[in-house]
Amino acid sequence: MDTNSPVYKRVLLKLSGEAINGKDGILNFDYIKEIADVLKKCMDKGVQFGIIVGAGNIWRGRSGGEMDRVKADHMGMLATCINAVALQESFIRCGIDAVVMTAVEMKSFAKPFVRDDAIDCLNNGKVVIFGCGLGIPFVSTDTAAVVRAAEIGADIVLMAKNIDAIYTADPRKDKNAEKISSITYKEILARGLQAMDSTATSFAMDNNIAIHVFGLDNCENIYKVIMGAEMGTVVKGE
């Protein structure tokens, strides 16, 4: 393998809200800048990026107590847009042309998601940040990531998590948990592993979308994975 050439041309990067969470606020702009610098390095090698960002640093629907689930999920969608605009602003400051596209129309500060427009932006060197998930309740941003990946023809979904791989159990609770380097969609579902929600896993399996789960404790991990480093967990078909 040519270690100077990226393994993937078009990537859907899923960032959790926790990944960009600040200790003294909801956003860590210094860390977002580090992410931008790494994306720029990848883009200089011809890599195209679509990004789905979660909202866990601001709001989680399941934390809404007795709140109506649909309303709670609507709040989550709005929170993803706050994160998306924050990413866009930081990327632009770092010299990256970025556009926010949302599943729910918010024309004052984002473009509506249109598949062909998103692909045109990618082909023209822009990072496309998808807000509002899929625009419907009861659907996670993990599921939104694999759906958008299918729509834009991404080579891989990079799931940047606050844990460095998929394990046989939660390593924070079970000291005997073992890291998994490669696993199939069916195995994840059969073993009930909490790598991502089952809807996202099933959709990825049905549409043969490869997923690479890795830790974002170091932003350089994005570059390393794209360049073919063996780290984290690769999820794919049989």
Task: Give the location of each predicted region.
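C-terminal catalytic "cap/lid" subdomain
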Residues: 1-238
